[in-house]
Curated annotation (Swiss-Prot):
Key words, A-Z: Cell membrane, Cell shape, Cell wall biogenesis/degradation, Glycosyltransferase, Membrane, Transferase, Transmembrane, Transmembrane helix
Pfam families: FKS1_dom1, Glucan_synthase, Vta1
Record's protein name: Callose synthase 7
Major localisation: membrane
Parts of the chain on the Extracellular side: 526-535, 591-620, 695-730, 1518-1547, 1598-1640, 1689-1742, 1793-1812, 1857-1878
Membrane topology label: Multi-pass membrane protein
Chain ranges passing through the membrane: 505-525, 536-556, 570-590, 621-641, 674-694, 731-751, 1497-1517, 1548-1568, 1577-1597, 1641-1661, 1668-1688, 1743-1763, 1772-1792, 1813-1833, 1836-1856, 1879-1899
CC per GO annotation: 1,3-beta-D-glucan synthase complex; plasma membrane
Reaction equation(s) it catalyzes: [(1->3)-beta-D-glucosyl](n) + UDP-alpha-D-glucose = [(1->3)-beta-D-glucosyl](n+1) + UDP + H(+)
GO terms, biological process: (1->3)-beta-D-glucan biosynthetic process; callose deposition in phloem sieve plate; cell wall organization; phloem transport; regulation of cell shape
Amino acid sequence: MASTSSGGRGEDGRPPQMQPVRSMSRKMTRAGTMMIEHPNEDERPIDSELVPSSLASIAPILRVANDIDQDNARVAYLCRFHAFEKAHRMDPTSSGRGVRQFKTYLLHKLEEEEEITEHMLAKSDPREIQLYYQTFYENNIQDGEGKKTPEEMAKLYQIATVLYDVLKTVVPQARIDDKTLRYAKEVERKKEQYEHYNILPLYALGAKTAVMELPEIKAAILAVCNVDNLPRPRFHSASANLDEVDRERGRSFNDILEWLALVFGFQRGNVANQREHLILLLANIDVRKRDLENYVEIKPSTVRKLMEKYFKNYNSWCKYLRCDSYLRFPAGCDKQQLSLLYIGLYLLIWGEASNVRFMPECLCYIFHNMANEVHGILFGNVYPVTGDTYEAGAPDEEAFLRNVITPIYQVLRKEVRRNKNGKASHSKWRNYDDLNEYFWDKRCFRLKWPMNFKADFFIHTDEISQVPNQRHDQVSHGKRKPKTNFVEARTFWNLYRSFDRMWMFLVLSLQTMIIVAWHPSGSILAIFTEDVFRNVLTIFITSAFLNLLQATLDLVLSFGAWKSLKFSQIMRYITKFLMAAMWAIMLPITYSKSVQNPTGLIKFFSSWVGSWLHRSLYDYAIALYVLPNILAAVFFLLPPLRRIMERSNMRIVTLIMWWAQPKLYIGRGMHEEMFALFKYTFFWVMLLLSKLAFSYYVEILPLVNPTKLIWDMHVVNYEWHEFFPNATHNIGVIIAIWGPIVLVYFMDTQIWYAIFSTLFGGIYGAFSHLGEIRTLGMLRSRFKVVPSAFCSKLTPLPLGHAKRKHLDETVDEKDIARFSQMWNKFIHTMRDEDLISDRERDLLLVPSSSGDVTVVQWPPFLLASKIPIALDMAKDFKGKEDVDLFKKIKSEYYMHYAVVEAYETVRDIIYGLLQDESDKRIVREICYEVDISIQQHRFLSEFRMTGMPLLSDKLEKFLKILLSDYEEDDYKSQIINVLQDIIEIITQDVMVNGHEILERAHLQSGDIESDKKEQRFEKIDLSLTQNISWREKVVRLLLLLTVKESAINIPQSLEARRRMTFFANSLFMNMPDAPRVRDMLSFSVLTPYYKEDVLYSEEELNKENEDGITILFYLQRIYPEEWSNYCERVNDLKRNLSEKDKAEQLRQWVSYRGQTLSRTVRGMMYYRVALELQCFQEYTEENATNGGYLPSESNEDDRKAFSDRARALADLKFTYVVSCQVYGNQKKSSESRDRSCYNNILQLMLKYPSLRVAYIDEREETVNGKSQKVFYSVLLKGCDKLDEEIYRIKLPGPPTEIGEGKPENQNHAIIFTRGEALQTIDMNQDNYFEECFKMRNVLQEFDEGRRGKRNPTILGLREHIFTGSVSSLAWFMSNQETSFVTIGQRVLANPLRVRFHYGHPDIFDRIFHITRGGISKASKIINLSEDIFAGYNSTLRGGYVTHHEYIQAGKGRDVGMNQISFFEAKVANGNGEQTLSRDVYRLGRRFDFYRMLSFYFTTVGFYFSSMITVLTVYVFLYGRLYLVLSGLEKNILQSASVHESNALEQALAAQSVFQLGFLMVLPMVMEIGLEKGFRTALGDFIIMQLQLASVFFTFQLGTKAHYFGRTILHGGSKYRATGRGFVVFHAKFAENYRLYSRSHFVKGLELVILLVVYQVYGTSYRSSSTYMYITFSMWFLVTSWLFAPFIFNPSGFEWQKTVDDWTDWKRWMGNRGGIGIVLDKSWESWWDIEQEHLKHTNLRGRVLEILLALRFLLYQYGIVYHLNIARRHTTFLVYGLSWAILLSVLLVLKMVSMGRRKFGTDFQVMFRILKALLFLGFLSVMTVLFVVCGLTISDLFASILAFLPTGWAILLIGQALRSVFKGLGFWDSVKELGRAYEYIMGLVIFTPIAVLSWFPFVSEFQTRLLFNQAFSRGLQISMILAGKKDKETPSTKYLGHTEESFGLEHDTNTFNHYYLWT
């Protein structure tokens, strides 16, 4: 090795630069070792997996070294040394991240191995490696050809390739022998055929996998590999500097995608990925309903159908832009080949487009030009397609990425940097939509092709001069470009702009009702009187002004996009504005002439117009004005006509539609068919009639008379300084009264929507058969038709069989056979999940073979106790006739089956055991006697029923012996003895003439000895006892005889019951027929994952919190049945699990009960298991195997053949991709959590071989001598204990930098999905095995011809929330979420037709969406709620969204108060951003009126209504504040006529329904009633109220209102991680204060002051019950907002915790802020961050903040005039003096503060003198005020109420004008004022908590309140709260223990609280 060592370690022996490494080897080795240390030696990372990203190419070498280490350690050493040399050449200075540590670690390892490794085959390294290479080739590759799988061969070829590379560095070229060279050339020639593959090993030789033998795959490959007549590309001499591989690119191509790659320069990984994608698509579509005989080629219709799907959007785009489509097919061309070329080209563009995939029309533009190039290459030559014509090809495989995608990506990156991490206004930068909509205009063709990078799209005016020292991968911000088509302006006016028709309807209806109510009669019929009707016509004037407002908003808010608009669009905006202005002038003028006896302004207009105007001119004007609305109504009634006109691109139609709506590429033709239109119109007509009637009779009419009285009153005695004392009509009073009423009027439609949606949803759910099977009793009663229903719905009938239309109770044996396979697998799965025990499993199983039993063998849980009951019935039967007894038995359906089965099974078991023919004859004769006596109706006379119980007992003993241990010595004798006893009982005790049978047997056998009887039944066949199916029969019979309890209690687990009943119930619901697996749609599942938990570690399971509670211990108490089942499973001796296996099983058991990735993956992989089982079943039926039952164990060849075919079809139909965005970083990380996530994900890949993991790989590569980061999308699979790379596709840059994280994570991985459908699953979801059977039914919903309707593009599925059983909060959230994903979405889909995509597990039409922007939108901030935008986009582009409830998936939710609040805040933020978005604007404007109403009230309108609800309380209380402080309440409202009217309170009572959360509860009650029964629903409702559900919902109302309003006003939306923990933990007071201070506490305290002031100074309505209810509801709101976080905080009222929280809060308040001080450490840091939104808001936002702050000045203004010291003076001087006092107080406080800073440390005496002087001055002033001026104690308290709000107003204004106050030097004073207020608020909130904490029972009550639901589930919270776990108990480390080994030490002195993990 000497020569190799010296020659291999550098050109000059040991290079100098390696000396530091060697000298630091010990130190660096320690660092490296630390990097790879792992507590479990078996899980220690392998060195090949620790390679730094800049050295990624050496990882395969190290993997090979590890693979051959056991075989030849010396050669493995040489491989590692070669890797080290290569690493040193790649990075000689070790500048890359982690390179130095890795090289040091590797060098240290080499030094160790050099001493211990020995030569095995030769004496020198060159000879050793050559001999090993030859041996390896001969033993593995040569012998493995045709025998090993492609996957195994791929690995062998990879090893051989690396070995030869190493060999060349060890052996000089001249010394490599011929055999080695020959083998190496053979490897080089074939290695590409054996690359690692995803699903299809396309070019692999040797043993074919089953999937490659499928005829559809062969046909698809044949079509894709048709390269006849394609010209061969060549490369220009300019590419001479390319490496050898690239120069070889032009030599050959195997398929059309390779040809496209050579022409355009697509990456090899992209080509391989899309090749498989296209083949699978073709195969899956083509095989559908096709005869497999003579199946050799793809049908032309298949390619045509695929073309139509992929290019529907492209063709629409071409028509819209009026340009010719380049999908051209010249005469004489191979149309199929050309079609596949076009499809392949689109797929390759899409596969490499990265972030540009979010821009579908940009992709259309790219494809448009490249398709033109393809056509030019193929048909543009003079001598076309002769095979020898060469065309210029792309220079390298990254040409397309570099020249097309990267420039567009850089534009995106440049724009997103203007976003400033969400702080910049949306109008300041262009998002994905803006850049994509650039291609909606014909001006996009100015980009030309190849794209001109100097075009306006790429270059900004100030980018000519580059920024100095700018890195090459950076982009300058440049000058802002205009928005495209729309500007996302941050204003509430967006709500009016988007939904103007709704607001106009509500305003005009309100005006109409007020006019009608103003009539003296008050009757609604008054509208038909002439004067009222004439007045009602004024609504058109209002309408004109509202239209003017709409036109103005359109003009102003779209101004930022004007530069991108066409002239016709700008003219439309201007014309609309001018027309609206004209009508706003004309209608009032014409109306003025029509008024009789005009006065005032109307008289002026009337005289000005002149006498030539006729009185009816106004009527003509109205007719002309409403003409467009009449046309709109016609279009509404004829949706097909509207749809045709909107989609038309004819110029005349475009001109006609120009006025109605702006021409836009999307949002055309979204109108529904007539029946759907009728349904949602009926819904809304009924709702609006109810709403308007209620508003008229309850809200408006009762207020009219008091308003008239107030209008006529004149008040002179004001109690404050009135600025307008001579004003008439008391406008202020009227506004104060009508303000809340108007707000309630605009909001209460939301209440009516909740009521009507609940009613319609309940009715529709009932008609959908929901909840027909709710309990196990119901399941048991209907189980006899379940097999028929199962086969009718979930199994395809063979060809030629008609589908049964009606289910009946006749049972077909083949139905039972089909059903039993699936049912038993379902039951076994639940056992594997520990939901049921072994015994419960046996009771639930259906026999897997029919045997010789003549009746249906039902599961034992249906037959439980039937045999004992029948025996008792027979024993006690007093009648004489057999018929009566048998009639009694048959009256119980299952009892008859049980009796017959038991009899026949006993007969078969005994008969099968006997070997002696005479013994068998006795048994036959006994059975004959039984049968003939039954037929002849003499059974009771021939048999004694009294002996039956004794026989049953003996049979039970007999069966138990048969199932006992076969190895026991007396096993046979025991069986013989009991068998003889049984025969004796039958013949002697049961049969009347039984002795005759024995005597005949004796005579027939010729034996007359009397003792022969004792020798009978001794010859038995014990081999049967080892037969599995025979033992199953014995077990089943034993269960029939022994199970006594009622089957209603089986299974015990509530979850198992729920799953069984839902599955059975779903079989009776409407669903499409199941196709054969081969005919079903193929689909993928995609799960985005970031850094969440994958699998809990052993340390996490056993880590105790401060109360000694572990996750494991906690879960044992929550799931006691499942824990018991788990212990039974792992302790089963048959499994023989090692301690290590038990530890792994324990980790999985815990992880499968949390919200972990492992749970999600397990659930999704059930799809594959179900598909394989369904395939298996179909194959067995096709081959008529075993009467429809599964093949027996003996038929192993059939089973293997069927299994291989089933797996192949499952590969074809299902793919699961988990997008682990940072998997690569986790793999290289040294942090234990990241390493754990990496290892756990790897183990998932190894456990589930078909699981695929996609991740973004970040590498350091040297480009032009400089290191830079390069990003790749990579797809992995598990292979031989490691991950194996399948595809690697280079990206133009970091994809997640452009948009929101989750959609970008999905987008990079979507290219690796397959199939026609795509299901999106979050990592906190679960799936259930039995639900997977229905997947092929669900996918049939996409079949466009199924119901004659347009096919859906998104299928919505229901969810089951599995986190509701822990605490009351979890239960509330679970119920709320469940009602939303069931009844809520049911109504949205039908009848309202406005369901979108609300998260997962929805199923997308994959091809539709990947050609239209993907399955989500990703623009920063605006698409924060990325999932719903997928639904918006789908609907706008002509999609159709449905909802289906016969299938469900599981979903977890956050269960802690703070986590729930984070979630609600995130959703409210998202809705705020939606309000600003173009999608909501376009949907709101382009839906018809009623569908628009549905859209509004189910999306942003719900949150706006929440905000109005809160605003109503404010308006009401501030209105009352105005009335009581001004004295108007006493003067006006106390008059008898006004006092009698309490309409305002009645209206507010309706509002409080929303406020208290009853709207949330209504759908919950209906859904629970439907699915569990209305008694249960009523009970749950009562329990929820007792557990303070209304407090929770009222609190969340405040969360919604705050974050929705703040988002629209100021922005600041961000993704809020909410956690996936098990349950809640105690949150400190400071944490709660930080989280809820601004959203709830400030608002709550403001309402407290309002209520106190009104209580002190107001006097009206005190006796009214409605007033009391309103007051109560407001105090309830206040209490909820102030104290809900503490009520729902575990241990929130425990004294010690309260003391600790106060200490922590004081410390936090006192800490100073500064750079680097986090917000949870210092109040100053938090206070600064709380104002972050004001730093970045615009001028409008600041002005609004100041205006809102001015309301706090009203308190001081009103209260000072009510002070006794004011002596009823109402001059303005009083108010001025109050300000002087306030400023004096603030000045004194400032002096104290400054004195403390100046004198506090060095001049203590001076500071004390200052304080003394101030104190004396204060006493003097107070004395004078009390004695001289008449100040009272009540005045002091009133002054506090007056001045506190004023100080808060000053503080808010100071924050809004921060820069101004800083400039004036007052900012420190503002900060100190803020700190003082925080202290006051904290003290006010904390005091009640501290008082309640004094009483221990409060804490106990709170615990019961929080965890009552868990108590009802058996959760022993009392044990957890009472004491810690017994430390002496054997640890829960491994689960070789039973449940009893986990005890609790009862200690009443331990802390009475508990923390659990999040």
